[in-house]
């Protein structure tokens, strides 16, 4: 399963990868959630190549959250919203999704 995580700090990316990579079934792609020039285009490129999108609400701008929702809808991808910004809450959401799809 390929997952895009939108929001969060760059130093957490390695930890997410280590925790989720243990399953051997997860490939993670990150977008920091900071609005940039070409934000919509970059998000759409990212989202079209993944199976699931997780938006970390507390670590993402409103603009990036809305751009992510629109891009996911356009690409017909599921979006999960996480209120927790900690690694454990994200891992639990992904693990729950993996258990559901297995």
Curated annotation (Swiss-Prot):
**InterPro entries per record:** UCP020408 (IPR016772)
Report the domain of life of the source organism.
Answer: Bacteria
Q: Which Pfam families match?
A: DUF2325
Family named by the database record: Belongs to the UPF0751 family.
Q: What is this protein called?
A: UPF0751 protein DSY4013
Lineage at the top is: Bacteria, Bacillati, Bacillota, Clostridia, Eubacteriales
